[in-house]
Amino acid sequence: MYKRQTVGIVDDVTFRSLPVGEEISLAKPGTFEALFFGLGADGTVGANKNSIKIIGGTTNKYCQAYFSYDSKKSGGYTSSHLRFGDLPITSPYLVTTPDFVACHVPSYVDKYDVLKGLKAGGSFLLNSVHDAATTCETLPAHMKAYLAKNKINFYIINATKIAAELGLGSRTNTIMQSAFFKIANVIPFDKAVEQMKKAIQKSYGKKGEDIVNMNYAAVDAGGDAVVKVEIPAEWASIEDKGFVHVSDASCPEFVRKIVEPINGLKGDDLPVSAFTGREDGTWENGTAAYEKRGIAVNVPEWKIENCIQCNQCAYVCPHAVIRPFLATEAEAAASGVEWKQGLGETKDYKFRIQISPLDCTGCSNCVDVCPAKEKALVMKPLESQLPQQRNWDYIVKNIGYKQVVDKTKSVKNLQFAQPLFEFSGACAGCGETPYIKAISQLFGEKMMVANATGCTSIYSGSAPSTPYCTNDKGQGPAWANSLFEDNAEFGLGMHVGVEKLRDRIQESMEQAIAGCTKCSDELKGVMQEWIAARGSSAKSAEVSARLIPMMEACGCDYCKDILEMKDWLVKKSQWIIGGDGWGYDIGFGGVDHVLASGLDVNILVVDTEVYSNTGGQSSKSTPVGAVAKFASAGKRIRKKDLGAIAMTYGYVYVAQVSIGASQMQLFNVLKEAEAYPGPSLVIAYAPCINHGIKGGMTRTQTVGKEAVSCGYWHLWHYNPQLEEQGKNPFVMDSKEPDWSKFRDFLMKEVRYTSLKKSFPAEAEELFAAAEENAKWRYNSYQRLAKMEY
């Protein structure tokens, strides 16, 4: 009888899979295969694209390149697969038996089997922060054995240090590319240097002479700094047990059996049975907390003596890796770490800022915003801060989050609440995630999220990493992603579905109140309270806490029916989240439909002014003069005013915010938007890696502040409830801008300076138009703010 068989799937349920044997090399004679392991946004993929072009353009060799990477915005795993040879290459698959392997990320030697398949006599290049002796000491045993037994040529280079010294930050790509050409000797090295520098001029010429010269220096340094390591003879006697991932037994079974293998690039080896009970695609929350990627070069160190306990560092952290904790005297003493006495409302507790170094991406936004006279945070090498990981684990597990202050009272108080959005795969210094994190702290335990496809969905729900998590009661955000174009409608449907369930609860209560003889008068009174309060999150939560035990004690049929739906007693906080490509462009029709519905949902548009997820294409949010894909000569049409359009309904709460400019305004807007009994729209300014910010993403918060102070962005909110009180519903929250700073602001971002280099005459015209447009918009807001009511 005919049976379907599968190859590449371990089917231990229907037993129809065929086993796959050992890897064999099918490359044609003379074909050179190379494999490069990199980190998302470190430039490895781009460098290898240039390398294959150089080889193809300067020799008669056939060339092929494949690139593989995960969906993290940056800081994720990447691999580059290069082949070149004298015969046509007909290998439509990734490199599995390379002649050359380069590991650009030092920590990968402990995470992945980077030497797997490397041919005997091949070459291995490692970016190591240590000298040769220390590198040899720290290599895993299986690597030592493999290097020795297969007579591998082993090279190291401290590209991390060189990049830092040259001002390239974490971009080691050019240095490692130069080292590859020095070792591989595919073409004469001096010719490779010449071609690399030509490619640099072409790639970075528009970004300025300084960038070009830094990369020139990186090329020279990469060739000079390569060190060949002599492999000790005794390594050959080490038993090669292969790469073994040691799992933490305390991790949940789902993490150990599914998440860790996928993170370790072993996901294809998972058997079908591992997914039993998860056929619908449901995924556990909070799995990002188990990644512990350790990708930062430098992470913050807390200077306890300088800290003024403002908690601003925690508020702006894009990945929720730095948090304030409160402890009793006994808890602090038992922890074995240093605490200081709390201030103000927390004066009866010990206070500590704790960092999770292995989750940090090293953006240093926390250092940037620290207002202390002497910074309470300084960046230090990751290795020096690894002991802090034990402190983090201990404090989270044994001390936790104390609800001793009202989190809705101030920004400082809010930071003592657990973020229910943590350790996402967003870029270091991401301008979007602090907004989502703040919402999760305010409303996370009752939060439902419909997420548009884009950056926000990629870092929020890419298997196996889920940053949305739960509190100690198992409460947390419910998250789902439909499509790019229908997210607003999808979120509205979530809200309508929940309210239908709550209608059933109300019907049961009304029937119980009218005719149940088992329900006490007191219980019926509380049911009446719930019916009156069902539209309020806070009040419905307070009433539900009293109602549930009373219904459990009653046990009548009405109460049983209601208890089956008790998860819906507390009003949910429905959020619809996406970027400007969604909110301004592709999903705008849906956004308008949802706002017009008048229903109680909240929309957050994180505005990067480009399609960030797909590489920086122009959107209707892109301002005049900005260079983006599809607007390479500068955008010619002014930015769409999404907030002004929404205000025309008159019954929509609308606000424009920037966390870098006013932390308190954002805090107040989020509370008001959630409390407003109708649709709300919050538009948040989000500096992005696509902007090419001078100084890098370490300046995210400062950029948000400068954007408002110069008039590039404006803070305001429109609350229809104020009109009901006889007040002007439109409130301008930012001061009059200093327009003299406007041009300086533009010149701090490559998306504007590149236009000046390419089209200087047009640039002057467009920059002037951009300033005039910003003034026009500000003046229109001022007219609204001055209207009499």
Q: Positions of the model-derived regions?
A:
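Conserved small/polar residues in nucleotide/adenosyl-binding loops
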Residues: M1-Y2
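Active-site cofactor/cluster-binding pocket
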Residues: K28-G40, T44-E260, E331-G336, Q617, ...
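Thiamine diphosphate
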Residues: L18-L26, F32-A120, Q312, E432-M448, ...
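Ferredoxin-type iron-sulfur electron-transfer modules and their immediate structural context
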Residues: A192-M196, G205-C360, V367-W575, A626, ...
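Glycine-rich ThDP/TPP pyrophosphate-binding loop and its adjacent helix/strand module
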Residues: V114, C556, V570-I576, D585-N602, ...
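A structural-propensity feature for long, helix-poor, extended segments
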Residues: F67-V105, E209, V219-D220, S465-G515, ...
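Short internal beta-strands
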Residues: S123-V129, A452, I603-D607
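Flexible loop/turn segments at secondary-structure boundaries
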Residues: V13-T14, D42-G46, K72-S74, V109-K111, ...
